[in-house]
């Protein structure tokens, strides 16, 4: 911040748990934007003991054994980076034993315990750390961990003869095939994600859209407005204040899948999941995007992805809130003050951004971060999240030759294209090309939520206090997405890589959108008390 007073205001806000986005940032004339009460405020987030066990501490830091390296697919060595580690103790695995890959030591321990019907007790609190160096200290906790990661009691022979009950053969065969696919994919693709730097420089002189699009206004009049049933969504209501639709998440410790993703070093952060998932279909209800490619059962969805789905907002409720807000905006204006179509679109995008911020602040992992890190991540990716949200809406709901709005209305694409300026037309064209690519890939809801988290937890953001957590989330989500695509789309061997290659395209479109929005803002077409502009100023500061 440029002045002592601005810094003092910001520090005072932080003391009370609130930080204005864009406060003290310069406007187009170089003057600081005051920290008005109408700006979005972020609450001071205290780190919860969320359980990638209890070792995050006050700083929200990840435990040492989860300090993972940045996810890259350049020069990936299968032997080094995809080497299997025992899920019980972290030692090198020797093969499939009693339901999953384990080391020789844990195999023998599990077999002796079951065959001899041993009963152990723990002299501590039944949460002893089990690793290669101290796996023999507490047999009780070691055996419990064997069971929790999926070793099967029924696979041990009761007659003490060598060799287990080989009823898991098909599962082992499938798991081996999956690993070979991973190895081939990683070696073949050699992906390196780089953000595209091409941004169209030409700015349009003006934007006028045909009155045919004005059906947005008339359609909104037909929707019954029930303010009692809808929480307020205006600028005086911060999306960082708990609302009736805020999501609640169980502690990490209760999530079975995290034992695979979050408890071991980076080379073990892979979702092999030899046994079926326990999550029920009801655990992913509440999200209305029903994609055409929904063929996978919960048994083939990594547990981490199921938890990401739980963070998703209720789309009909978001749609109703935005429509109610637009109704109220129009009702409060006289005939001569009615919003232009462009102004209406800006309000629509602005309210969509509010819902995205609400989603982020209630999401798993993100809420573990301190306020400063949350602000930096959101300021970095807000436009990408908006574009991704729009793109996915078109993939799922859009019809050929039309644009599907967040309010649930279809607008003729050709009308917008014929009336828009050069830059907006180009931007829309690129967006439609991306929609077509994702449709051809059969882009689905599970992949959508993974990409959202990959965009939000960007490794490009500098000066993060808890970069290790961001890095860990990137690797976990990448691993879950890889497993999901391999398991559910085996015929599309390159799908994982193709999805990742869409991220630079989303970044390029978002950069174009930011430039266009800033141009319209300089022309006075977008008001200051707008979250889009506050975010834009914060990113450019």
Curated annotation (Swiss-Prot):
A zinc finger (NR C4-type) spans 86-106, 122-146. Keywords: Activator, Chromosome, Developmental protein, DNA-binding, Isopeptide bond, Lipid-binding, Metal-binding, Nucleus, Receptor, Transcription, Transcription regulation, Ubl conjugation, Zinc, Zinc-finger. Changing residue 314 to R: Decreased interaction with PPARGC1A; decreased ability to increase transcription of target genes. Zn(2+) 2 binds at residues 122, 128, 138, 141. A motif (FTZ-F1 box) lies at residues 168-187. Changing residue 168 to A: Slightly reduced DNA binding. Strongly reduced transactivation. Abundantly expressed in pancreas, less in liver, very low levels in heart and lung. Expressed in the Hep-G2 cell line. Isoform 1 and isoform 2 seem to be present in fetal and adult liver and Hep-G2 cells. GO terms for biological process: acinar cell differentiation; bile acid metabolic process; calcineurin-mediated signaling; cartilage development; cellular response to leukemia inhibitory factor; cholesterol homeostasis; chromatin remodeling; embryo development ending in birth or egg hatching. Its main location: nucleus. It comes from the Eukaryota. Residues 1-35 are annotated as: Disordered. This is Nuclear receptor subfamily 5 group A member 2.
């Amino acid at each position: 911040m440029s002045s002592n007073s601005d810094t003092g205001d910001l520090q005072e806000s932080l003391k009370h748990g609130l930080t204005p986005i864009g406060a003290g940032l310069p406007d187009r004339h170089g003057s600081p934007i005051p920290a008005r009460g109408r700006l979005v405020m972020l609450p001071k987030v205290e780190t919860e003991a969320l359980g990638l066990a209890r070792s995050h501490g006050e700083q929200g830091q990840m435990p040492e054994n989860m300090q993972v390296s940045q996810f890259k697919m350049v020069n990936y060595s299968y032997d080094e980076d995809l080497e299997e580690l025992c899920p019980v103790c972290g030692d090198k695995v020797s093969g499939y034993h009693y339901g999953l890959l384990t080391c020789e030591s844990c195999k023998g321990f599990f077999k002796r315990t079951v065959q001899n019907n041993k009963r152990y007790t723990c002299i501590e609190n039944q949460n002893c750390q089990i690793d290669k160096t101290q796996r023999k200290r507490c047999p009780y906790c070691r055996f419990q961990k064997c069971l929790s990661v999926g070793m099967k009691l029924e696979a041990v022979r009761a007659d003490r003869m060598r060799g287990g009950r080989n009823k898991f053969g098909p599962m082992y065969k499938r798991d081996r095939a999956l690993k070979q696919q991973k190895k081939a994919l990683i070696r073949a693709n050699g992906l390196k994600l780089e953000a595209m730097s091409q941004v169209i420089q030409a700015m349009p002189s003006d934007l006028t859209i045909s009155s045919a699009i004005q059906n947005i206004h008339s359609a909104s009049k037909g929707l019954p407005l029930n303010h009692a049933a809808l929480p307020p969504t205006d600028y005086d209501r911060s999306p960082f204040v708990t609302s009736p639709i805020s999501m609640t998440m169980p502690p990490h410790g209760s999530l079975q899948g995290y034992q695979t993703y979050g408890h071991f070093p980076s080379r073990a952060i892979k979702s092999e999941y030899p046994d079926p998932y326990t999550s029920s279909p009801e655990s992913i209800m509440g999200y209305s995007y029903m994609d055409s490619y929904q063929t996978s059962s919960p048994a083939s969805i990594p547990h981490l992805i199921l938890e990401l789905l739980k963070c998703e907002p209720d789309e009909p409720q978001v749609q109703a809130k935005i429509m109610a807000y637009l109704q109220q905006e129009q009702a409060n204006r006289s005939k001569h003050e009615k919003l232009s179509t462009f102004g209406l679109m800006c309000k629509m995008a602005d309210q969509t951004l509010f819902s995205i911020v609400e989603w982020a602040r209630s999401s798993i992992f993100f809420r573990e971060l301190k306020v400063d890190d949350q602000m930096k991540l959101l300021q970095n990716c807000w436009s990408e999240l908006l574009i991704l949200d729009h793109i996915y809406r078109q993939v799922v709901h859009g019809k050929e030759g039309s644009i599907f709005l967040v309010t649930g209305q279809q607008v003729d694409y050709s009308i917008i294209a014929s009336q828009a300026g050069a830059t907006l037309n180009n931007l829309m064209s690129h967006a439609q090309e991306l929609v077509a690519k994702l449709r051809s890939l059969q882009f689905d809801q599970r992949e959508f939520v993974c990409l959202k988290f990959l965009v939000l937890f960007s490794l490009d953001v500098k000066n993060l206090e808890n970069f290790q957590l961001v890095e860990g989330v990137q690797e976990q989500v990448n691993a879950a997405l890889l497993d999901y695509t391999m398991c559910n789309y085996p015929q599309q061997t390159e799908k994982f890589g193709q999805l990742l290659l869409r991220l630079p395209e989303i970044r390029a479109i978002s950069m174009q959108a930011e430039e266009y929005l800033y141009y319209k803002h300089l022309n006075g077409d977008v008001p200051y008390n707008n979250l889009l502009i506050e975010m834009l100023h914060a990113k450019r500061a």
